[in-house]
Design a protein with these regions (language model features):
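Helix-start/capping segments and mature chain N-termini
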Residues: 1-74, 78, 83, 89, ...
Length: 183
């Protein structure tokens, strides 16, 4: 099961993405992927906090998301496990890398049901693709994910996830997951 639930630009509902959007041309935007399980979004406030921080850092308008949980609980069955993706872009501000402060970019909300592998048995490999260091983007889920695309392509057959290191060889994240460790 997969669907785009809602898409809007400048506060107005739209039916298809706008190809002149800076998110398509420059990766000028952010996203959050959130697990929907048991009828609710897991760690919703943490995702909102990170999205708000990212919007501040990149100069994007934070979308109004007050009804998202209620809307999802109406369209998704309580027993479904799904990944909800929220995308926020800078919108259309003209050609070139520079942009004016946007009054509202493209915002897209979608979901896809998922099968999660047994959490006690996941094939993991260290990716040969190294993440570059950019302090201004650290901690943000920005739309330029080419390093992760290349890392996923480099995984051995049958391997579910790859461990991503930076250029100094330090553990940063999984290709598609967070990494936590305890001393």
């Amino acid at each position: 099961m997969s669907a785009v639930i809602a898409m809007w630009s400048g506060g107005e509902a739209i039916s298809s993405p706008i190809l002149q959007d800076r998110g398509f041309h420059y990766g000028d935007g952010l996203f959050e992927t959130i697990l929907f399980e048991g009828g609710g979004l897991q760690f919703w406030q943490r995702h909102l906090d990170r999205l708000e921080l990212g919007c501040q850092r990149l100069g994007l308008q934070m979308p109004a998301l007050s009804g998202v949980i209620e809307h999802l609980s109406q369209v998704l069955p309580i027993d479904v496990r799904a990944v909800v993706k929220l995308i926020v872009t800078a919108g259309i501000t003209g050609r070139g890398y520079g942009r004016d402060v946007t009054e509202g970019g493209l915002h897209c909300l979608s979901y896809e049901s998922i099968d999660v592998p047994d959490k006690n048995s996941v094939a993991l490999s260290t990716s040969p693709v190294r993440l570059s260091r950019q302090p201004l983007l650290a901690g943000l889920k920005h739309l330029n994910r080419l390093e992760q695309v290349l890392a996923k392509r480099s995984l051995p057959e049958g391997c579910f996830e790859g461990l991503m290191l930076d250029t100094e060889g330090l553990v940063v994240e999984g290709i598609m997951s967070n990494v936590f460790y305890q001393k």
